[in-house]
Amino acid sequence: MTSDGATSTSAAAAAAAMATRRKPSWRERENNRRRERRRRAVAAKIYTGLRAQGNYNLPKHCDNNEVLKALCSEAGWVVEEDGTTYRKGHKPLPGDMAGSSSRATPYSSHNQSPLSSTFDSPILSYQVSPSSSSFPSPSRVGDPHNISTIFPFLRNGGIPSSLPPLRISNSAPVTPPVSSPTSRNPKPLPTWESFTKQSMSMAAKQSMTSLNYPFYAVSAPASPTHHRQFHAPATIPECDESDSSTVDSGHWISFQKFAQQQPFSASMVPTSPTFNLVKPAPQQLSPNTAAIQEIGQSSEFKFENSQVKPWEGERIHDVAMEDLELTLGNGKAHS
């Protein structure tokens, strides 16, 4: 009863599967028939040729497996009843054949070579044998009259004897052995955070090196008393330097620490038009300017460890905070 019930159940399942499966159209069925007829015609011609010209014991109605067995037997292979195929004298172990779809042979890539990269090689990877490279190396050309040399001009003293021997290898890089220090302590792979930190540190270094040049305020005017100095005043056409309030507005901005440590060079001189205001170029003194400088020494005074000279007609230390008045939109100062 159980077997009958199981049979009926399986038949019902098969019928349900056939009912739900899509039925092929008449064109698809015709194509399948034509394809099958062509395959059988080709197989029949193959069998006829093998029977006529080959010493094959093929049955009258045989399939492709029989033909494959006959061909393997002629080529020196052994085909067992279960389909195990191997060369004569190289029968594989039962463990090697179980669970593998491809038959392993001594010439198969599944067998690891003793010279594989997983083993410690006594020969360095860049030292190749003469037969391993498809291109001859100029340092190991045995025959000077070898016509296969790609660069014939390198044979007759083309390479200096002082250079080390050239090693050429076309093989892929091998895995370093376990005894290698790079294998024990591999370099960490770069991450986005490390790359960002490195780029930020490089940008900071570049910005600090750019601060080595002295900076000066562009708004610093050229005082008329600079005519008494060693150079002619530098003028800025875009600015009106007649206003005396720009002199008393604030100190000049200068970072002269780096400039004091080492002398100026042609590459360090900034292109600002007011650079000559602070670092004048040396010029020869004329007798007139020397006399004027001696006259004006009495009106100098110390300001931040430097000599400051007033303009002609200018009063220093006479302007107090009480004399200044803040006007909002009047445009008129307190007289």
From Swiss-Prot:
Keywords: Brassinosteroid signaling pathway, Cytoplasm, DNA-binding, Nucleus, Phosphoprotein, Transcription, Transcription regulation. Residues 22-103 are annotated as: Required for DNA-binding. The keyword Oxidoreductase does not apply. GO terms for cellular component: cytoplasm; nucleus. The modification Phosphothreonine is found at T175. Residues 1-40, 85-122, 164-190 are annotated as: Disordered. It is found in: Nucleus; Cytoplasm. Ubiquitously expressed in cotyledons, leaves, hypocotyls and roots. Interacts with ASK7/BIN2 through its C-terminal domain and with the bHLH transcription factors BIM1, BIM2 and BIM3 through its C- and N-terminal domains. Interacts (via N-terminus) with REF6 and ELF6. Interacts with MYB30. Interacts with IWS1. Interacts with ASHH2/SDG8. Binds to MYB56 when dephosphorylated in the nucleus of quiescent center (QC) cells. Binds to WRKY46, WRKY54 and WRKY70 to cooperatively regulate the expression of target genes. This is Protein BRASSINAZOLE-RESISTANT 2. It comes from Arabidopsis thaliana (Mouse-ear cress). The lineage of its organism: Eukaryota, Viridiplantae, Streptophyta, Embryophyta, Tracheophyta. The gene is BZR2.
